[in-house]
Every structure is written in C-alpha cells, then in structure tokens.
C-alpha cells in the first residue's frame, strides 16, 4: 500500500509561519531552531502514520513524499526507513515556469533529488513523475542510474479551470478518468525493454481490464486511487477477481507468463507505439 504523499510545500509553509510569528529581531540560531521544529512537527505526524500502517497490515507499506528540491529530505528519508517503511516513493512534481531554465538542468534536479535520498537509505526508491519530457527513455535511464529502482507512470497534476463569473481559477476533474490511462500504457510498453527496473502504471486505472492491459504492456504493478474513491475499497477485490478469471481463461498460472507480452519489444505490431501509426490513424496511410 502506498501512503498519501507528504508535500514539501506543507512543511515549508509551516516553517515560514513559525518564522514570521517569531520576533523580527530573533537571532539566527532561533530561526534555525524554529525551522527544525516546524519540520519536526509535520514530519512526526507522517512518521506516526507509517508506524500505524505497519501495525495494521501485513503487506509492504510504501511512504511517499512530494518533493521539489533535495535539501529537505537528506535526514528525513532515514527517519522514514527507521520507522519501518518498506520503500519510498519520490513524487517529483516540477512545473517549470522560467523560459531561461535549461531542460537539462530540470532533469539534473530530478536526478539530484533521487541521488541524495538514495544515498541516505537502503530501502528501494521509486520516482513518480509526469509525462512531459522530451525523451522519456533518456530521463528514465538517468533516474535509474541515480538510484531509482522503479518508475511510477504518471503523476497526475492539478487540473485547473477558470470560473468565468468569479474570474478565479478552480479545480476541475478531481478524479482521473479511464481515458487517461493511455499515457502510461504507451510509456510502460516502450520502457519495458530498456529501463531495467519496476514500472508502475498509474492514472486512469479503474477496473480489472485496465490492470490486465498494464501488465500486458509490461507493468510490474499498478497504483489505484480515484476508482477507490468512486467505487469504494471493494473495487480492489472486484479487480483482482477479474484478473484471476482472465488468467484462467487464457491459460496463465503466473503473471510473469504474460507480463510485457504486448510491450514494444514483444508486440506483433511494434509500430503501434511509433509515429507511423499516428499518421495511419489520421490519414489512413498504410
């Protein structure tokens, strides 16, 4: 089970509030103390969640942090490991806004976050990322070399909308839809041959059929969220039942017998993952 992410911005907001409420004439040592205390209060709450989760279930518990820098997690990753987390998911959600920022520098920031965290812990580290990279295969290779044992494809970013009466931004599409799964399905199928680690399908996986598709593409596992809010926790059993029936119907005893069967490497029509199929779909060129 993957726990909800703790956001770096939440911690920093609490820290900044403590600093603001302190005396403007406070000594630097006091500011440092307040910063550490703010980090401690928020992080302690999350560590307790990990401990309680480990006590409640007998399956692996994966902690998750939503981070935008490497500076806040050097020591905290050790605490996450110490309280019993079986793995750590780095939910890396960078939204570049500066046109002067080199894309390579953005990639280096991601690699640095992974390197710093992995250097301090022994449990597996997975990177949860968005789909917006020029070369996903190259970025995936860089994250693997930086220490990521797995990739979660993909992070689902905030979906904004505009209220034309109040002239304000508002949230839209809080939950994913089944149609969103195609993003991860394609990348999982392409990366299956080259990544060399675990690939986790995410976003838009709402039923058992979607699970089968992800496994056929090459996924090691899938993450579920929206479908559980919409349909309840009983949806897990329904999806597993579908998977088991599908395996019996097709003569499979083990998931590894068909995992990656329709990846780009093994597909009978690998061009479905390439530009030629895009042209064919639009203009009917064979």
PLM feature spans:
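Short glycine/proline- and acidic residue-enriched helix-loop micro-motifs
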Residues: 29-37
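Helical hairpin unit composed of two closely spaced alpha helices linked by a short loop
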Residues: 223-227, 231-232
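Generic anion/oxyanion-binding catalytic loop in active/binding sites
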Residues: 35, 62, 99, 228, ...
């Amino acid at each position: 089970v993957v726990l909800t992410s703790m956001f770096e911005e939440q911690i920093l907001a609490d820290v900044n509030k403590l600093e603001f409420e302190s005396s403007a004439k406070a000594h630097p040592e006091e500011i440092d103390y307040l910063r550490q205390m703010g980090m401690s209060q928020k992080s302690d709450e999350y560590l307790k969640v990990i401990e309680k989760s480990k006590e409640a279930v007998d399956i692996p518990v994966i902690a998750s942090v939503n981070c935008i820098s490497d500076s806040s997690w050097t020591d905290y990753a050790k605490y996450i490991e110490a309280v019993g987390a079986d793995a750590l998911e780095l939910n890396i959600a960078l939204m570049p806004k500066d046109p002067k920022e080199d894309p390579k520098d953005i990639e280096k920031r991601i690699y640095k976050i992974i390197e710093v965290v992995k250097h301090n812990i022994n449990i597996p580290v997975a990177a949860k990322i968005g789909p917006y990279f020029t070369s996903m295969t190259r970025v995936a290779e860089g994250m693997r070399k930086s220490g990521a044992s797995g990739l979660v494809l993909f992070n689902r970013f905030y979906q904004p909308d505009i209220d034309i009466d109040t002239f304000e931004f508002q949230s839209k599409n809080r939950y994913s839809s089944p149609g969103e799964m195609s993003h991860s399905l394609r990348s999982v199928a392409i990366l299956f041959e080259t990544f060399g680690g675990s690939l986790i399908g995410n976003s838009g996986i709402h039923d058992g059929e979607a699970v089968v598709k992800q496994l056929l593409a090459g996924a090691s596992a899938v993450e579920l969220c929206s479908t559980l809010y919409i349909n309840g926790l009983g949806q897990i059993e329904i999806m597993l039942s579908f998977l088991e029936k599908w395996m019996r119907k097709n003569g499979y005893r083990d998931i590894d017998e068909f995992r990656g069967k329709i990846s780009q490497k093994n597909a009978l029509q690998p061009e479905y993952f390439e530009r030629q199929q895009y042209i064919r779909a639009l203009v009917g060129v064979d």
